[in-house]
């Protein structure tokens, strides 16, 4: 048996499929997954006490993801989880000879090894120590998947109770309440954020498939997907914070400060969006290979045509463009007090500034591409070295009038660029 890694669907893509317009499932967000996972783990004798202890030791309030991440890093809770299966040879805690600061990793390693050797989990679907002790949410998703699979075995063997069956259906209860305009806008923010992250996750899975199958060269993979993994890692963390705020009472929520506080983190978008022309050019060149990569039904919908794939790849820019609009709606229709409105104004300004900085990055990349093209078009540089010209500041097509042109009455069209003066 192995942890589920998301199976593919070999059926044909039908006309009714429209992955572009799917709405994100709340239960698939890492925040909600960890809320449910903590509930499930509470059925393991002694586990909830460990989580509560970690919660109390924290210097600040922890979101559900950070809380479980820190708990699992202790190592011994994972051993506790495994030994609840009542194996013939339970995992023993590291002996006293292991340094205190190494016991967590030693315990976690024993847990993974036992999952592979004794439970038959596929090693490729298990996590490595970097996934647990690193800082990438994609790695922690693997940890969550393995822990969930062990819980599935415990429930199947009737060794613990499935705590989900006794939980109240809060989501259903919320649907029966009449929402204010403020709540409608916030719901749109949260729902579309979940959808966006799930679309990024789909893109990442497709990228991983392309790399695994060696569908296109590595340089082409980079030209298309660029720093997608970094964006997804950031955006998962941002969504965790969005969902944490959404849990608060309406009077406590401060969406403006969220964007002010996270503004600098959005810089991760600049290289990705600046790469859009190179991305589109590479997609056009490699599309037939990408279309034949296979994968899940969702992936094949995504590469049904060039426009569909490129539309997915441009979702980061579309999302950045959406934030100022949502904050603007909250300012106009949210019926906030003066202090919250001022914070929203500051948040909107921050979100707009992020968009401006990414547009500047696009301009810089366009000028770099213009210089690369110029190098291929000019045959004789008359002894000049392009590398010494400095950064191209401005370029365009202009009418240039030269003395010989005046004599003949003909104007010549030239492409002209300017660079900063060199001493």
Which residues does each PLM region occupy?
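An all-alpha helical bundle fold corresponding to the catalytic cores
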Residues: 1-387
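Structured beta-rich ligand-binding regulatory domains in large eukaryotic signaling proteins
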Residues: 389-423
């Amino acid at each position: 048996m192995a942890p589920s890694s998301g199976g593919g669907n070999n059926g044909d893509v039908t006309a009714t499929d429209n992955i572009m317009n799917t709405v994100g499932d709340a239960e698939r967000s890492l925040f909600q997954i960890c809320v449910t996972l903590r509930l499930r783990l509470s059925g393991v004798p002694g586990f909830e006490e460990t989580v509560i202890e970690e919660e109390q030791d924290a210097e600040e309030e922890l979101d559900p993801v950070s809380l479980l991440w820190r708990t699992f890093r202790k190592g011994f809770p994972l051993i506790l989880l495994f030994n609840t299966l009542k194996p013939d040879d339970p995992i023993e805690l590291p002996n006293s000879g292991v340094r205190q600061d190494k016991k967590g990793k030693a315990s976690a390693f024993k847990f993974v090894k036992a999952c592979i050797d004794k439970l038959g989990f596929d090693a490729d679907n298990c996590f490595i120590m970097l996934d647990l002790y690193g800082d990438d949410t994609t790695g922690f998703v693997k940890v969550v998947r393995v822990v969930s699979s062990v819980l599935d075995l415990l429930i199947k063997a009737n060794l613990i109770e499935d705590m989900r069956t006794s939980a109240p259906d809060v989501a259903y209860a919320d649907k029966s309440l009449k929402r204010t305009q403020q709540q409608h806008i916030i719901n749109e923010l949260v729902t579309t954020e979940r959808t966006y992250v799930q679309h990024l996750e789909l893109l990442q899975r497709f990228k991983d498939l392309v790399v695994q199958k060696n569908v296109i060269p590595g340089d082409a993979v980079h030209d298309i997907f660029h720093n997608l993994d970094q964006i997804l890692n950031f955006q998962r963390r941002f969504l965790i914070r969005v969902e944490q705020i959404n849990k608060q009472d309406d009077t406590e929520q401060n969406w403006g400060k969220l964007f002010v506080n996270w503004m600098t983190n959005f810089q991760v978008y600049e290289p990705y969006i600046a790469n859009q022309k190179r991305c589109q050019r590479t997609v056009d060149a490699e599309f037939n290979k990408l279309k034949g990569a296979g994968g899940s039904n969702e992936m094949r919908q995504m590469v049904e045509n060039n426009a569909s794939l490129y539309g997915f790849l441009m979702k980061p820019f579309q999302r950045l463009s959406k934030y100022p609009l949502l904050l603007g709606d909250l300012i106009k229709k949210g019926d906030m007090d003066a202090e919250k409105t001022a914070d929203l104004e500051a948040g909107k300004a921050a979100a707009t500034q992020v968009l401006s900085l990414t547009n500047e990055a696009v301009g810089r990349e366009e000028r770099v591409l213009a210089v690369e093209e110029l190098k291929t078009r000019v045959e004789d540089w008359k002894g000049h070295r392009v590398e010494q010209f400095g950064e191209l500041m401005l370029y365009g097509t202009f009418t240039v009038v030269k003395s010989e042109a005046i004599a003949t009455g003909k104007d010549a069209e030239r492409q002209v660029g300017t660079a900063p003066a060199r001493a």
